[in-house]
Amino acid sequence: VAAARRDFYGRLAHEAWHAYAASRLRPAAGHGLPPWLDEGLAQVLESAPLEAGELRLDAADPSRLTALQALLREGRAPPLAAVLRAGGDRFIAGHASAAEDPSHAYLVAWGLAFDLAVTQPLLAPQAVVALGQGGDGDEVARFERLVGVPLETFELQWRRRMAALRPSAAAAVSPAP
């Protein structure tokens, strides 16, 4: 019962994020959040432990972190450019090509969102809105403006940060009441 409750509240937080982002973070002339950021932040919220009545967004999900670190170590993680350019269907199991595993893009999206929201906090409200003003197909350029360095440089640094990241003790706490 406890596991089912955790899963339910995790899914609820994930889907609530999508509803919030669609209604509050879509600029009037924009296209909403890029799929990698929308799915990544939804996962950050989904796995955030509840501690003293507050969500701990700074606690890396141990299972996602371990899986992402294995992908990076084994060279199976998709390049960041591919994840940044991916459409929403890349994150859905039934729509990915046979050569792609959507869970890999999903894990990378989680790692990117966690890094940009927590480890290297760059996701100020204005930055999130700017990322959603896309639609011109230049996702990599918008990302480079956000992080302030070329994607290749960021990717090397990000991979090192993810490899060195350890889950906090709070991450072992239930993500739901």
Walk through the language-model features, giving the residues of each.
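Active-site scaffold of zinc-dependent metalloenzymes
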Residues: 1-6, 13-23
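Acidic/His/Gly-enriched intrinsically disordered linker/tail segments
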Residues: 7, 11, 29-176
